């Protein structure tokens, strides 16, 4: 690719150092100076090899002078021809691959060739090149010479005068009669690295995915802090903009147009289309706009500030009308601590920033072309909505949990027993990955994997240390308390839920009461304690009796059929039933001797017996499901409950009185 860029003729160029008078032919190459040739533009081709030029430290570099001859510098198409040869003599195959060329016009030549004939030791700061080689060819000639100017060469040169940031010729001579220019460099090029060395393996990207997420979160948090501080100046800026809208609008538009035109002529670098090559456009470097410059430029806009709120995905088009966003703020949601929600909201905010940058670039293009400030909001909205399916993006393209082929196990409670399957089938279902860390496993090493009874998957020896634990599914389905080998992840999960009451036998394993007699006995005691505890809470003299309930977890006496793994193991060992019986005995003794508790009992209305009965007497008492009254089991008839009959008669009486009054 060949690109041209012009420089102002009056641009200051400092003299180059090391000027001497010398002319001649180097390495037997013919002299390229032709005084009869008509003046034409100078062609300077910048060529860079795709490999990095590295100078070994142990190799003694031999200096070799490079000659070039030019006529007197002028403004009418002066030609600049340089002869250069690499000391190490790189092969043509190394210099011929993937080269980028840049043609400098006569103005550029005039600026470069205006060196002082007397010489100077100052460094040139107005002309810098970063390509590996500079090939300068005079139009009409087939000879091409190379000048190594790679920053890598400059950086590894053992000589202190070499600068790694700028291209600085060692010697430059402008003869009065011939205008010869001599350039000398000391370089040794070695193409010792292949391009594959600089390519990261896929495994590294997979393993470091959490680093990318951490960087995104840290970047978002730091941006939030900055935005909170910038919000304090929002009010003053808005007042300033509103005051200048009426008076300075024409000046603002003129300033905006001028800055955009200056930006178009700035020094930029673009991709040349060839591997490892870049095209440099040599032009005056324009000053980068600061935050306050952008604010002054955008005085003519109506919407000055852009507010990006987490969770407010539908209001993104309201901010698209702003051409240059000057302030962004992020607000918090109540459930901001959720990791999945945080990732989704971060993705939304980054997409909003992306769409705003697209709008700004479209606005700048429209201003430079037609001078209008018109943004097609509807088009931007459609494009944004079509490319912003957050759920699909996170699920398929940017999965946080592992990769598309593997995902780490989830923190979940499994209530089913895994059927026995062949090892090869299970590992094949895992895509030959370790279920814990995602390490690929070759088929010949499948036998070394270890099976986890809780998850029903195979793990490597790093993720499975032969830890043993009870399986909840086997306890609830088969009343099996044997310990089985589980993975490290499963062991940690089961230990974390060991004391948590999350197993409701009424909904999970109701048939378990018939299989386990000790569990059925605990169920009966638990029902009595459930009712008597309610009665004791209403008595102001039952403090000593209520303290007895502190010996067991609260869920055993507050709710029915609710157990933890620890409770089930204690029931199996026979440790929980005696403790519950002692608590029940102390509670019954208090109720029998307390007048307040006796006054809250029931009298059986069927037999009219004066003995007080209570709901916790499950052996002799039965409660009506409708009115919750207590009766003797042998006396109770659900179809003829006296209390329910009285309630029905009272309701009918009230309805009849209300109808008669109307």
Swiss-Prot record:
Lipid bilayer topology: Peripheral membrane protein
Assigned keywords, A-Z: Acetylation, Autophagy, Cytoplasmic vesicle, Lipid metabolism, Lipid-binding, Membrane, Phosphoprotein
Domain of life per record: Eukaryota
Region annotation Disordered: where it falls in the sequence: 1-34, 58-131
Compositional bias annotation for Polar residues: 100-113
Expression (tissue specificity): Expressed weakly in cervical carcinoma cell lines.
Low complexity bias: start-end ranges: 58-71, 114-131
Primary location class: membrane
Induction: Up-regulated by epigenetic drugs, such as azacitidine, and artificial transcription factors (ATFs)-induced treatments in cervical carcinoma cell lines.
A Pfam cross-reference name: RUBC_PIKBD
Record note on what altering residue 157 to D does: Phosphomimetic mutant; impaired interaction with STX17 and abolished ability to promote autophagosome maturation
Modified residues (N6-acetyllysine): 483, 523, 533, 573, 633
Cysteine disulfide links: none
Subunit structure: Interacts with UVRAG; the interaction is direct and promotes association with the PI3K/PI3KC3 and HOPS complexes. Interacts with STX17.
Name of the protein this chain belongs to: Protein associated with UVRAG as autophagy enhancer
Organism: Homo sapiens (Human)
Gene name in the database record: RUBCNL
